[in-house]
Amino acid sequence: MEVTVLEVAPRDGLQNERAIVATADKIRLIERSVEAGLRRIEAVSFVNPQRVPQMADAEAVMAGVPRVPGVSYAGLVFNDRGLDRALATDVDEINVVVVATDTFSRRNQNCTTAEGVQRWSALARRAAASGVRRTVTIAAAFGCPFEGEVSAAAVLDLVRRVAAAEPDEIALADTIGVGTPDRVRTLVAGTAALVPGVPVRCHFHNTRNTGYANAVAALEAGAGILDASTGGVGGCPFAPAATGNIATEDLLYLLHRMDIGTGVRAEAVSATGTWLGEVLGSPVPALLGRAGGFPPARPGSQ
């Protein structure tokens, strides 16, 4: 079995950091990720820099990323202005977020969920015309920090609505880390049944220590792409206590011990997590860098 791990540390991982990370360090994070074998990377966010100052240098980051055959760079886009910026940097993919509840959608994107669907549809048409891969992410799919529970029926209805714009991929995001494996199975299997042939991707946070169990449940239910953040850094600046992306290195250890292939070197990602902690000035939440792999690597082994 093979699974794609999509690295989100350069975007979702860093966006919640208060101290601005230098552009050169962002580019180095991406370079190290590519060197470790990661081939899909969400590198930047083309949003209003006043709302997310950490992403103000998106164009500079994209100008410095290594252009390696087989490596695909994604940018988060909310509106036409963001898409204009993204297309000008030659991104390979765009990710457009549609939030599952009106309250969170207004706080996150200043629009209702219905308006978010309309925005996504318009952006998808433009991106398709430009030959750019299109992902739509349903945020707060497993629960909302303001409205509480979000029913599976409501999420699957939203899947049906966003699917009308023919995404290349549909992502289900546990934005505040409240999901559990049973709910994950229901939504992943339900999404796959509604849009057969469209890959299902999942984005989990480990806020309440369920992220890795949810990742396994997603794979069992048919998801083929998992987001993860080197070091386990990140969160949403517009959702209270939305901390703790699942850590790329810890997820890789789990997958590799289950004989699930990724094409990524966990030890290299773990070393990057340690380096990233030094850049940020505090140890990262990931555990592999502290405990090490198993069986322990022999000197000189790869």
Describe the predicted segments one by one.
Residues 1-302:
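Catalytic cores and adjacent flexible loops of soluble metabolic enzymes
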